[in-house]
Amino acid sequence: MSTDAPPADGDDTFWRERRTCFLTTFRPDGTPHLVPVGVTYDPETRIARVISDGASRKVRNIRAAHDAGAEARVAVGQAEGRRWCTLEGTAVVKDDPASVADAERRYTERYKTPRVNPNRVVIEITITRAMGTAKPSGW
């Protein structure tokens, strides 16, 4: 499918409704680390965001991949009944105030205002693949 123009039948609402998602990162030894998270997704930029404490295992896994000179490959997914979607891509950790504030705003729109965390960072995932029965527009 062309990635230039989103089809009209994408299921963007599935990524706006409140639900628990899961993020998979990989430890330095290659084993998967799967955790429940809140995810926001922007179909126009194809970027998913997860807010997190900067000392969390998921953040350390992503930073370790970059420190080793590799891309940090990750996946986020969610399901409800027979509807499901997994988004795969590459992740970076951002800690600059503008990126964190933007991610917090997006999180608040989908979930609720996050608790105060002075160590908060945002994991930004550039999506390279979408699969499932409720894929967002463009896939």
What positions do the PLM features span?
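Short beta-strand segments
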Residues: 18-54, 73-77, 86-87
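Short, basic/aromatic recognition patches
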Residues: 1-22
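Charged, gly/pro-rich active-site loop segments
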Residues: 2-5, 81-139
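Active-site histidine-anchored catalytic micro-motif
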Residues: 69
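Short helix-to-loop capping/linker segments positioned immediately adjacent to catalytic or ligand/cofactor-binding
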Residues: 10, 22-26, 110-115
